[in-house]
Design a protein with these regions (language model features):
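Terminal, non-globular segments
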Residues: 1-170
Length: 170
């Protein structure tokens, strides 16, 4: 038996805003300096850049990056640069990624998510901060592992029920 093909409804802009705000609030939780804590804003931003590149672009990525920099008390622009580059990469390859299965998508977005961790890492090193260790980059791999779950959860409101009605023209 083959998997059903879902026809997605148009995305509600309020749902996009809600999901980005929820991801931002998850990043605000006091996780501490534990390695492997995912950057939820980067994950949700990457998802919407791939699925709705005309609604969520590099401007939103830059603004969210500035908010993350203010929250983390980092050099202003670290996350803004990382999120903008992540958004640019996602918008560039979004058509190819949408044709892949979720498992393959996970490996396709992994370099972008790890790259989004490398940018602030390199900026901090260039500004003279001590080397935080390679565990800092683990969160990019954790985000890639969360990609299938994030895709399923964020697409749920758009899915139409599979209805075996043979009299329907579409």
């Amino acid at each position: 038996m083959t998997r059903p093909q879902y026809i997605l409804q148009p995305v509600n802009p309020y749902f996009i805003a809600f999901s980005l705000a929820a991801a931002f609030l998850l990043n605000l939780l006091p996780w501490g300096k534990l390695p492997g804590i995912p950057d939820f804003v980067a994950l949700v931003l990457l998802f919407w850049n791939i699925h709705q590149p005309r609604k969520v672009g590099m401007g939103i990525a830059f603004c969210l990056g500035l908010l993350m920099d203010v929250h983390n008390a980092n050099l202003l622009g670290e996350h803004a640069l990382a999120y903008t580059l992540l958004s640019y990469g996602a918008i560039t390859i979004h058509r190819r990624v949408l044709w892949m299965s979720l498992g393959v998508q996970m490996f396709a977005v992994m370099p972008m998510l790890v790259g989004a961790q490398i940018v602030p890492f390199m900026v901090r090193l260039l500004m003279g901060a001590p080397f935080p260790g390679w565990g800092y980059l683990v969160s990019g791999f954790v985000e890639a592992a969360l990609w299938p779950l994030a895709s399923i959860v964020l697409l749920l409101p758009q899915r139409r029920p599979v209805d075996p009605d043979d009299t329907r023209p579409i």
